[in-house]
């Protein structure tokens, strides 16, 4: 990992370099550090199997397992970043942080659902259409609010591009992490945004194509989706560390990055000398 850290500190990586370096680390983790990846794959497979049984209880359980996958995937940020930095991985409050982020996401989805339902009920025959569960008709009725919410979500998203790796791998409160994320965004927004959009498009296209294969495609999608999501976390972690290493970090953020401790160690060494 010394060579990787050296590369990340030498200068800003190009768009292609980010993916190449991330893929090399992805291969290394598949070979030598694949426990978490296998756990994610196993949970995803079981959740997918439960979702197609038609049993309401198992379908509900599959949704819960899906939430577990998201939380564990987010926790992977710290594991990847600490692996690169060759620091001892300690799951100290990480689960709570990941759960907090997940709850915020659920709260946002719940809030948007309430808005959409209210919008439908204000339309003529909206209640009847909702009760028929005609999803195509419902989506057609919601096309305008969906576009508006999509735009709002995108605008919000471009202001939190570095929040996940920061909050899940560094110290500090949620709002301190938000502030540090905003600092890292200065001049570095596109570096994270374009790869994340690319991953999103690939996932959407892949799902649409594989679902045409029926159940077989559904399970193939589980393997590919798990691999892509892990690769996405690694790529985002690489970009984040590269930005952090090549940026002049203000003293107010030293505590988050651990530089405060490094500086104190240097002072102590000089005093002993």
Where do the PLM segments sit?
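Interfacial aromatic "cap" segments that immediately flank transmembrane helices
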Residues: 6, 10-47, 89-111, 155-207
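Membrane-helix interface segments in multi-pass membrane proteins
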Residues: 44-69, 88-95, 109-154, 203-229, ...
């Amino acid at each position: 990992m010394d060579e990787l850290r050296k590369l990340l500190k030498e200068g800003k990586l190009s768009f292609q370099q980010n993916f190449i370096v991330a893929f090399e680390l992805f291969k290394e983790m598949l070979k030598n550090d694949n426990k978490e990846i296998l756990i994610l794959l196993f949970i995803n497979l079981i959740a997918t199997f439960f979702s197609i049984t038609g049993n309401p209880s198992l379908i509900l359980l599959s949704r819960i397992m899906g939430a577990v996958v998201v939380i564990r995937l987010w926790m992977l940020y710290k594991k990847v970043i600490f692996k690169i930095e060759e620091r001892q991985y300690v799951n100290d409050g990480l689960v709570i942080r990941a759960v907090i982020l997940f709850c915020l996401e659920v709260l946002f989805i719940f809030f948007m659902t309430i808005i959409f339902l209210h919008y439908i009920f204000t339309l003529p025959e909206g209640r009847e259409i909702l009760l028929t569960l005609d999803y195509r008709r419902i989506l057609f009725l919601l096309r305008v609010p969906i576009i508006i919410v999509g735009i709002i979500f995108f605008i919000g998203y471009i202001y939190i591009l570095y929040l996940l790796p920061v909050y899940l791998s560094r110290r500090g409160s949620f709002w301190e992490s938000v502030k540090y994320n905003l600092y890292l965004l200065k001049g570095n927004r596109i570096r994270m945004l374009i790869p994340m959009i690319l991953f999103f498009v690939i996932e959407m296209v892949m799902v649409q194509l594989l679902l045409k294969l029926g159940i077989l495609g559904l399970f193939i999608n589980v393997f590919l989706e798990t691999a892509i999501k892990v690769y996405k976390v690694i790529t985002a972690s690489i970009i984040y560390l590269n930005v952090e290493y090549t940026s002049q970090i203000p003293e107010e953020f030293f505590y988050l990055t651990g530089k405060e401790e490094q500086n104190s160690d240097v002072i102590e060494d000089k005093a002993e000398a």
